[in-house]
Amino acid sequence: MSSELPTEGTDLVNLVTVSSANWDAVVKTSELPVVVNFWAPWCPHSEKLAATFQSLSHRFIGRMKFARVNTDENKDLAARYGIMSVPTLLYFYQGRPYFQVIGDAPKHQLESEMDHILAQHKRCLSRSSERPE
């Protein structure tokens, strides 16, 4: 992946790279919805989505947090959330997953989904099930 992307735990405006060590602090305890990009460095679709994801993180500052998980380095997180393909975007609210997008998608599609999710996240949460830790 590109060397200009943030390293673990660093913040690039609204985009944080997370691991098992900081998962709870970044994702589980967030008051805002969090979208997590599960990616792998060997995947060209992950690399393509990275630029879109970073761009979208700027648009949603203060309304949604953005996080990245390298699945090669964090197999436990990928397994915990059933990530079978990269890239996968998994949306969380109050620490609970409630929506996912598998594969690369055009920016306008992701932006539209994110707007919809922000409008509906509390209702979506009431319909989601908590996954075991």
List each language-model region with its residue ranges.
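Structural microenvironment flanking redox-active thiols in thiol-disulfide oxidoreductases
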Residues: V69-A78
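N-terminal leader/targeting and pre-domain segments
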Residues: M1-V34, E111-E133
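Non-catalytic, surface beta->alpha helical segment in thiol-disulfide oxidoreductase systems
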Residues: S85, L90-S126
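Hydrophobic beta-strand anchors of alpha/beta hydrolase catalytic cores
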Residues: V35-V36, F66, L89
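A short glycine-leucine-enriched loop at secondary-structure breakpoints
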Residues: R80-M84
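Typically the conserved alpha-helix immediately C-terminal to a functionally engaged Cys/Sec
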Residues: H45-F60
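Short pre-active-site segment immediately N-terminal to redox-active cysteine/selenocysteine motifs
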Residues: E31-L32, W39-W42, S85
